[in-house]
């Protein structure tokens, strides 16, 4: 089923501006409560000016530009401005530190970065490394440092024409984005996402929540994540709805913001639902216009029931990952929820449960969740410059191995059991155990290390490190956590540390993690 046709992202925005004109497309609220608002027509002009800005800086079709930004309208301008000229966005998780960010720049060969003043000192250090491909920074903010190779985004953009000046031939098969996501190896993989992927995501996710042009979709999810892009922004814009982007999540402010913008749809991760539930009950708890709340793993049935009862909303399950672009298994519009099922497979996809020999399993048996889609259209195209990793995850016929365990019932409803891959889910972020183990093992006092996820009432999982010290060494908790904080993003820092004399291993030498909690 081809629901996109040949319409690329440039055509999409030109059409949206023509159809919806002065209708509100984007509302942004900062942490300080400052609100910026754009109609479909004015947002398209901002996108065009940004595209012209990139062109003036030498960016052409196929070039890669990194964005290291918190939620802001400029992220939207850059995302689609790059797409309009056939360039490729490389969003960087705004919580990453220097070494992690530099690795992404190096491996995607980014020469231009758009970032804000708070992240600039980190990138000034990165640019001092002769091996970095980064040679220019476009800075969002009021004050511009007197450094070579730094431009002021706002000033440059304001001088550009609202009419696009560079219009190379575009195809829906062209790459629009490389989104680096954590994997089971020590380094992230770049998920290649096409124009078709993003257009399909808009239509598919709009169908999933029955989105209309009179809806208001509010999100606090970070714009550098696939969730914000493909289950919030793209469906909202594709349906002609109003997209409300908040800079940061605040449990105290959330429901006031829902009411302020008369949001009809939003999305939550379990951490948000749990923190909202611990807020004092108020007479206004049910005074809102929300009809759907998209949510993602993992919540207990009791937590779901308590949330829906208190706030009078429907929770709509959506299961997917960066590689699937959208929630390929989930609840459907109008369906009765079948907890604890994650729902049924969506249109344009197939799903199977397979055993370790890659054979389909019957209903009720646990195996790996595998999804069939069309690479570059309904699922990701490939891992950037990693053909072996692509071949391992993606079969030639389009079957994607998710690395997650689950089963299905006789009626075709799927149930998630556990993540097979070596990952920890922490407050909406995927954290690679191997990556943390490699970083921590560099400590001169540590001989052996393993990290595991343990249940956390607020953030899904907490991170615990089990370490074996070199003979005769001592290591305080303060020293350990200080080392971690200086070498990894804050959300990756373990919450707990335990020193052991050895680690349990099987006959092949692999650590038996189930014996460590």
Swiss-Prot record:
InterPro entries: AMP-bd_C, AMP-bd_C_sf, AMP-binding_CS, AMP-dep_synth/lig_dom, ANL_N_sf, CaiC. Signal peptide: none annotated. Keywords: Ligase. It comes from the Bacteria. GO terms for biological process: carnitine metabolic process; fatty acid metabolic process. CDD domains: FACL_DitJ_like (cd05934). Its EC number is 6.2.1.48. It catalyses: 4-(trimethylamino)butanoate + ATP + CoA = 4-(trimethylamino)butanoyl-CoA + AMP + diphosphate; crotonobetaine + ATP + CoA = crotonobetainyl-CoA + AMP + diphosphate; (R)-carnitine + ATP + CoA = (R)-carnitinyl-CoA + AMP + diphosphate. Pathway: Amine and polyamine metabolism; carnitine metabolism. Pfam families: AMP-binding, AMP-binding_C. GO terms for molecular function: carnitine-CoA ligase activity; crotonobetaine-CoA ligase activity; medium-chain fatty acid-CoA ligase activity. Catalyzes the transfer of CoA to carnitine, generating the initial carnitinyl-CoA needed for the CaiB reaction cycle. Also has activity toward crotonobetaine and gamma-butyrobetaine. Belongs to the ATP-dependent AMP-binding enzyme family. HAMAP family: CaiC (MF_01524). This is Crotonobetaine/carnitine--CoA ligase. The lineage of its organism: Bacteria, Pseudomonadati, Pseudomonadota, Gammaproteobacteria, Enterobacterales.
